Amino acid sequence: MTELATQPAQDLAEPPIPLVFTDNAAAKVADLIAEEGNPELKLRVFVQGGGCSGFQYGFTFDDAVNEDDTLFEKNGVTLLVDSMSFQYLVGAEIDYKEDINGSQFVIKNPNATTTCGCGSSFSA
């Protein structure tokens, strides 16, 4: 009698994307960097305590890369996320929106259990 070796089926699903940095966001960052006149600038996205829901997002330009930063590149622009913030941003999408209410960077975060009406504060 012949025995057939069976192996568990491999999970063919793609691993989750750690962070999505949209074309719109990258284009706006490129414009802002050009206005500053410093091509070494990178957009740093971070999470800190505060806001009406417990955590809030922050954006700043930085020309330094820290040892614990994760870098994301899109269309020649670099996005930096520190290790503490990264755990709250895994799977999030960073976009730039312009509408009749104004323009702003927007984070769609699947880890947020509640969000504030302003969109810059969340709880996880």
Swiss-Prot record:
Signal peptide: none annotated. Required for insertion of 4Fe-4S clusters. Its cofactor is iron-sulfur cluster. Binds 1 iron-sulfur cluster per subunit. GO terms for biological process: iron-sulfur cluster assembly. Belongs to the HesB/IscA family. The keyword Nucleotide-binding does not apply. Keywords: Iron, Iron-sulfur, Metal-binding. It comes from the Bacteria. This is Putative iron-sulfur cluster insertion protein ErpA. One of its GO terms (molecular function) is iron ion binding. Homodimer. PANTHER family: IRON-SULFUR CLUSTER ASSEMBLY 2 HOMOLOG, MITOCHONDRIAL. Iron-sulfur cluster binds at residues 52, 116, 118.
